[in-house]
C-alpha cells in the first residue's frame, strides 16, 4: 500500500548473470534501502575517520570538518544533498533538496562492525518535513557484531517517533539448513558471512495477517550454488500467480560430470604443420675504396690520401607457430 506524501519504501529485485551470491542466491539481488560503506579499492580500512566512504556506490570526498562533524560531498555531484557524519554517536544524516532526511544510525543490528570499527552503516530511518517516517529494522542473527546484516522489517506511514501501521517483513530460512554456497567477506578486517536465504516477503497492517506475500523457491545448482527458480505472489484471498526462472546448465557427459572444455578442433591447411610457419632471410654487403695524390710549392701543401671502407650484414627471422583467431570469437 502507498504511504503518505510518497513516503513508502522502494523494493526491487534485479538479476545479472555476472552478479554475486547473496540472500537471494546467485545472480539475483534485492534493493530495499540505502547504505554508506567504507571504500576498500585501494586498501583495507584504517578506522581513523580518514577513510574514504561511498554512498550507494557513489564515492564521497571530505568537504569540511569540525570537532564533532565531518561534511562530505559526492565526487560527482548530482543530487546536491547535504551529507554529514556525526562523530559523537557515529551516525550519518543525508538531507536532500526537499528537506527529507535519511538517517544511518550506529546500531549493532544495522551496521557491519561497531563503534570505532564500523565498516557499513545501513539506512535506519527516513523522515520528511511533515515528520512522516519510514523505519528500517535489521538483524545480523549473530552474536558477533561483524555478522552479515539482514533486513527484517520496514515500517511506514509513521509519524515522528511512532512506527507506522503498515509494514513489510523479510523472512528467512529458519529450518536450520546450512547453505553450501555461503559468502565470506573480509574487507572490514573481520569475517562477514552471508549464510541465510530470503524465503518470502510479506506486507501487513498493524502486524496482522499478511495482505500480500511473495514466496521465493530455490534449487541447488551444479556448483552447489542456490538459484531462484520461482516467485509466487499471493494475497489474503488465497489468489496467487507464479513467475518461473530457467537456467542453462553446463554440458555433462554420460556419467553426469561437467564438461569444462570442448574437444580440441584442428584447423589444417594441407601443410606439414597445421599452423603456418614463415621463414625469411636477408643478406647485404657494401664496399668502397678511395685514393688521391696532391702536389704543391713552398706555399702550397701537397699530400697523398687514401682509404678503404666496407660493411656487410646478414639476418634471419622465422616464426615456428602463428596462432590466429580464425573464427573471430576472441
Where are these regions (language model features)?
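Conserved catalytic cores of ATP-dependent inositol ring kinases
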Residues: 1-300, 320-330
